[in-house]
């Protein structure tokens, strides 16, 4: 690694010294170790980098791209390499490139003479390098302390040592002239090369203003203080120079201004002078004009309609809000209302907002509801007394009289307000892709849904389906009670039709339903059911009376009086505990007289009586009498019935049985 560092240091010795001096002049200190590490990485991933170095900004941008690609492939690029690369890239931006080329005519006059003499003897490549010597500029020129200016001039401005003259002069307020109109005098060194110690020598002098690019004709001039209440820039305190213009990105006072965007400003200025307002479009602003301009003296000042452009950030926020949250989300509605009521939007502005924010299907919905709202508004304008002179072409921004931006900018305030109301109403009717707007009658509160969420869904559906505001309010108040769950209905019922005038009905309903469905509400309902406590103006108790004491609130089996009597009777009748298990059920230690079991320990059902008698034989009933059985062959020798019963009675188990009446008769 040591040989590699020494090799890199010897290979890029001159280029490294130039970079270090350049960065030091700009107030940035970079160690030689970090620069060598940077060029090691460059030599590894950018083998095309020239040994003598380069001042071309495109080459350093290419280095950054290739280092990023190497990082994506898994190669480790130290953080110090990225920092040093960014600093060097920023330092080389003022140098000559194809994108930011500077002509030779913009250089000082004395430099042009020497340059023209040398270009006759050298090639075109050497000439370009000479041009760079005069127009190159170090970055961050404010930091001028601890710098060897003689060494810096030899490296960056070698030809300036040949020039003779005084040092840089500070231009006072009275001598301020644009740098683009007159070249720098011969022998004058750029202000960025002069130490700031000269400024600190005389502390009693008032502060002076430096000259910066752009030239005076392209600099921003604040409007003067208006007599109609529009404040201008406050004047500078007495005894001080005017406020200096802020420095631009180019800090070299000898370099010409950047031409980036200047063509656009020239076109806009030209169009303003010619009266073409389409070149500087977007929301209209009304500014008062002095009495002498467009109005006679003594008359109130007239207003002038001017267009101001929407910011790109506003359009970007609209697009991202519609994409992430939907066109009718609370965020988008708030943002759209702020834009609609904060600007004087004409029909063309609404179309631009819708096209840039909505999808094609959503824009088609917006346009459809816009046209529908315009037709309804035109009917109202004609039916008004007196009729309002606002037609459909004006509200849509079409037709011969209202198709251009300049024509729409002159619309009256009443038409602007109607366009705003129609477009906001059309925006509210936009549906998200794949979703259909339900009927307000089908929106019902869930059993566990909070009441405010239910009301919000109901209002959203009603706003999309009902156009009239008064009818929408009545429907929402009605459905907020009818479609609520039973718990919320019971809480709202005492308030229905009794809300005082001037109060919001929905707000009172939400207050009444606050806390329903929570743990506290459930505990209160349980306590109410047990004790009959008044809750919400209602008393919930058992419907019947106790058959024992006649009181309301409990049944007979739970009557405290009856339970107290039973305990007293049991204590008086039974003086001792039962000795063993119940002889009836065999399951518990209690007396048989107090046994209430329906089954015994084996699961057999128990009768209601305590003792049972002897089992009885079932009696046969029928239409035919019972005939005794006589074997065949003995039918004629049947003994009389009395003999049969006498033989039976002689048996020991039937000694005491009386004879039947039929046997006695025989």
UniProtKB/Swiss-Prot annotation:
In this chain, composition skew of type Pro residues spans 232-247
Database matches in Gene3D superfamilies:
1.10.1200.30, Human Immunodeficiency Virus Type 1 Capsid Protein, Retroviral GAG p10 protein, Zinc finger, CCHC-type
Task: Respond yes or no to whether keyword Nucleotide-binding is given for this record.
Answer: no
Q: Where is this region: Disordered?
A: 165-264, 598-641
Q: Which residues form the signal peptide?
A: none
**Which SUPFAM superfamilies does this entry report, sorted A to Z?**
Retroviral matrix proteins, Retrovirus capsid dimerization domain-like, Retrovirus capsid protein, N-terminal core domain, Retrovirus zinc finger-like domains
Low complexity bias (residue ranges)? 624-640
Task: Output the Gene Ontology cellular-component terms.
Answer: plasma membrane
Q: Which residues form a coiled coil?
A: none
Keyword Endoplasmic reticulum in annotation: no
Could you list this entry's UniProt keywords, alphabetically sorted.
Answer: Cell membrane, ERV, Lipoprotein, Membrane, Metal-binding, Myristate, Repeat, Transposable element, Zinc, Zinc-finger
Subcellular localization is given as: Cell membrane
Question: SMART domains, alphabetically?
Answer: ZnF_C2HC (SM00343)
Zn fingers (CCHC-type): where? 544-561, 580-597
Q: How does the UniProt record describe the way this protein sits in the membrane?
A: Lipid-anchor
Q: Which InterPro entries match?
A: B_retro_matrix, B_retro_matrix_sf, Gag_p24_C, Primate_lentivir_Gag_pol-like, Retrov_capsid_C, Retrov_capsid_N, Retrovr_matrix, Znf_CCHC
**Lipid tethering residues (N-myristoyl glycine):** 2
Q: What does this protein do?
A: The products of the Gag polyproteins of infectious retroviruses perform highly complex orchestrated tasks during the assembly, budding, maturation, and infection stages of the viral replication cycle. During viral assembly, the proteins form membrane associations and self-associations that ultimately result in budding of an immature virion from the infected cell. Gag precursors also function during viral assembly to selectively bind and package two plus strands of genomic RNA. Endogenous Gag proteins may have kept, lost or modified their original function during evolution.
Q: What is the protein name for this chain?
A: Endogenous retrovirus group K member 24 Gag polyprotein
Q: Which organism is it from?
A: Homo sapiens (Human)
**Gene it is expressed from:** ERVK-24
